[in-house]
Curated annotation (Swiss-Prot):
This is Uncharacterized protein YqeB. The gene is yqeB. NCBIfam families: matur_yqeB (TIGR03309). Pfam families: XdhC_C, XdhC_CoxI.
Length: 541
């Protein structure tokens, strides 16, 4: 069998194989110039001389295939010493092992206009493409790249089963009206990337239905939806670029964003945020998307209730994704900085800010929202910003952001304080304090429902110790304290959104976005103009 003919066949079929090429030999060796093909099952075509050195090269080739990386092997025909292979020839050889037939596989569920455009572009990027649909006419081979695998099935569920989807595959669902059928089959499968081409409203509906079905949050968090980069894409070809950009980012483990140096002065500088609750997370997202690196500091057991939109959840789960941005728990400054380079938001347990000297941030944002200052000082960083009451701009910090709802929400205050907290939650359909749930006594939190569940007034949603906690009104559970946390009487443990199934519990609130905008405005102005310290007053230079 010709080694290159076999290599061409395996490459066409996208079957993994390694090519071992002798690149150097000295002294007595079985061969001085030869190639050998090693298949994924260990079988070979050709030979580099047989014996112990060939066995060793086969082992190295299989390891290279497993790691999907080429390598250089050095072997000495000796029984002892470095690089010895266990033979007596006395020579030495070096073998370069390259890996092939490992094109990433992209599976497209649905053969509509967008997936056709994605297939055409993905072929140019070297993907091995498979497309499935229930309409035979949509699978016209002329609409797809020549090497595309086309599958017709009676249902999308049957198509998913027939496609033999593997953990290293990238899968995009884009059907006319049967996305949910495919999603149900795929949501719990280990996949490198799972995307859904759908509107934000449809995504919210599907996420709620998946949770009602009992799908674990760790599986739901893997779904990329709505999918793609926000580049204003409208045509199938533009959408294809948007989607493939996200797939390539995941495939290449890259942070994303523009390659050019930002025209604004952020320069990817570091901002440390104290607190990682839902408001703090809205601030983090605003800064992250503006080009800043963000690290968040939390307490050991965060008491957030809007857990689906709070990066603090990473303290419990190790990882948390909000609106497509992922936070990961970090245990050291070095680990945190590496995570920022990879496009993540690190969350660290450091309520006392003891790591600031190591992190050396450009800015510190106090987003604890404790209604009092828990140790934030203006000299913690070149720029220090605080949210809400409890701070005095020009004394504790360089700027304070208004957090009360109304005309001044998000206002930047450079001298003085924010308004006092009203103590009245935001009005939703006429409900304010009634929709907020508080512990009737001290005890341990145990939930009976999940975030996103629809409940009726009087339903038992949790227990504090032996005390039943009942829903104060009919609606959606939008906030709920993590199980196992100890609380005191009167502590806020949850909230109900009276809008019911139309409520959105997976997106950052309008309040958080407004406050985040205020933080960004303050940071940009203070960076532009600089901050000059005097003995008693800090003023913008």
């Amino acid at each position: 069998m010709n080694i290159f003919t076999e290599a061409a066949k395996l490459e066409e079929q996208n079957c993994p194989f390694a090519m071992a090429q002798i690149v150097d030999s000295r002294g007595s060796t079985p061969r001085h110039s030869a190639q050998m093909l090693v298949r994924a099952d260990g079988s070979i075509v050709g030979t580099i001389g047989g014996g112990m050195v060939e066995r060793k090269v086969i082992e190295e080739s299989l390891q290279a295939l497993q790691e999907r990386k080429p390598r250089l092997f050095h072997g000495r025909m000796a029984r002892n010493g470095a690089d010895a292979v266990g033979s007596d020839c006395g020579g030495a050889m070096s073998v370069f092992i390259s890996v092939h037939g490992m094109r990433p596989r992209l599976v497209l569920i649905g053969a509509g206009h967008v997936n056709r455009a994605i297939a055409q572009s993905a072929a140019l990027l070297g993907f091995d493409i498979a497309v499935a649909d229930i309409y035979r006419e949509s699978l016209n081979p002329e609409l797809f790249p020549p090497s595309t695998t086309l599958l017709h099935a009676e249902s999308f569920g049957a198509a998913v089963e027939a496609l033999d989807i593997r953990p290293d595959n990238f899968v995009l669902i884009a059907t006319n009206n049967q996305d949910r059928e495919a999603l149900d089959k795929l949501i719990e499968q280990p996949i490198a990337w799972l995307g859904l081409l759908a509107s934000r409203r449809k995504v919210q509906l599907f996420l709620r239905q998946l949770r009602e079905k009992g799908v674990a949050e760790e599986h739901i968090a893997r779904l990329h939806a709505p999918v793609g980069y926000n580049i204003g894409a409208e045509t199938p070809q533009e959408i294809a670029i948007s989607v493939l950009a996200e797939i390539l980012q995941v495939k290449n483990n890259a942070p994303g964003g523009l390659m050019m140096k930002p025209s604004h002065p952020s320069g990817h500088q570091l901002v440390v945020i104290r607190g990682a609750g839902d408001i703090a997370s809205g601030v983090a997202l605003r800064l992250y998307h503006a080009g800043f690196k963000v690290i968040m500091l939390e307490v050991e057991k965060p008491t957030v209730i809007r857990c689906t939109v709070a990066f603090a959840q990473a303290v419990f789960d190790g990882e948390m994704t909000v609106e497509g941005v992922t936070a990961r728990l970090a245990t050291s400054s070095a680990e945190a900085m590496k995570l920022t380079e990879r496009g993540f938001i690190p969350v660290m347990v450091d309520p006392a800010c003891s790591l600031l000297d190591e992190l050396k941030p450009l800015c510190v944002v106090d987003a604890i929202l404790a209604k009092q200052n828990l140790g934030t000082r203006a000299d913690m960083a070149p720029v220090t910003i605080a949210l809400g009451p409890g701070f005095t701009a020009g004394k504790d910090c360089h700027a304070v952001i208004e957090t009360n709802r109304g005309h001044w929400l998000g206002q930047v205050i450079y001298s003085g304080c924010a308004q006092e907290n009203t103590g009245v939650p935001g009005n939703i359909m006429g409900h304010t304090t009634r929709r907020v749930i508080r512990a009737p006594a001290a005890g341990i939190m145990r939930s009976n429902v999940k975030l996103g569940d629809l409940v009726k007034e009087g339903d038992v949603i949790a227990w504090i110790g032996e005390h039943e906690i009942k829903a104060p009104l009919t609606g959606m559970v939008r906030g709920l304290l993590n199980d196992g946390l100890a609380v005191v009487g009167g502590f806020k443990i949850g909230d109900i959104d009276p809008r019911g199934e139309t409520a959105d519990f997976t997106s950052v609130s309008d309040k958080a976005r407004a406050i985040g905008g205020g933080v960004l405005e303050a940071l940009m102005m203070l960076m532009h103009q600089g901050v000059k310290a005097t003995k008693e007053v800090l003023e913008v230079a």
